[in-house]
Amino acid sequence: MRQRGFTVLEMMLVVLLMGSAASLVIMSFPAMQQDTAERQLQRFQAQLEFAMDSGMQNDRLLGIQIRPNGWQFQVLQSQAAETRSSVAHSDRWQGYVWQIWQPRQAALGGQVPDNQPLTLRLPPPQEWPPTAEPAADPDILLLPGGEITPFTLIFGEKDDRSEVWLRVDESGAIATSAKGGAP
């Protein structure tokens, strides 16, 4: 009587060979690229476009909190009734609070190196960084209809003379320093 299939030893050998081949492939990858300002701009732009599309498709109000050391995407969520009175400025959003937005299968937000601080420019009379605003509110709003708070985000390198920036108008059109122009 002949047996069909593979033995456990044969299967273990195949797994070992596949693991060895995978480790050789991974070792042949080039070293990680440096986190240049251009790379940070591309990462932010891709995340912004994803957030704008997702907000329109899912009818959600999203926001972006910008800090000199990075950015974070937020979503406006309903807050439980018993915790509304304990949160400062909770009446501002009428029972809703800003929470970190982490959609499935997407890692949003980012940190920048210390030598590449972010600078956000908002149209007058808005100012950044906010002085009287609570820290939990986003600096930029992405509305479900496709509108967005107009802004210019500068990815600075202290030792670099060229300025790397991204500008977005109220309709969501994006312009970058890679395409030329001035911020």
Curated annotation (Swiss-Prot):
Cleaved by prepilin peptidase. One of its GO terms (biological process) is protein secretion by the type II secretion system. The keyword Magnesium does not apply. InterPro entries: N_methyl_site, Pilin-like, T2SS_protein-GspH, TypeII_GspH. The modification N-methylphenylalanine is found at F6. The chain crosses the membrane at residues 6-26. It comes from the Bacteria. It is a single-pass membrane protein. Residues 1-5 form a propeptide. Keywords: Cell inner membrane, Cell membrane, Membrane, Methylation, Transmembrane, Transmembrane helix. GO terms for cellular component: plasma membrane; type II protein secretion system complex. Its main location: membrane. It is found in: Cell inner membrane. Component of the type II secretion system required for the energy-dependent secretion of extracellular factors such as proteases and toxins from the periplasm. Part of the pseudopilus tip complex that is critical for the recognition and binding of secretion substrates. Type II secretion is composed of four main components: the outer membrane complex, the inner membrane complex, the cytoplasmic secretion ATPase and the periplasm-spanning pseudopilus. Interacts with core component PulG. Interacts with PulM. This is Type II secretion system protein H. It comes from Klebsiella michiganensis (strain ATCC 8724 / DSM 4798 / JCM 20051 / NBRC 3318 / NRRL B-199 / KCTC 1686 / BUCSAV 143 / CCM 1901).
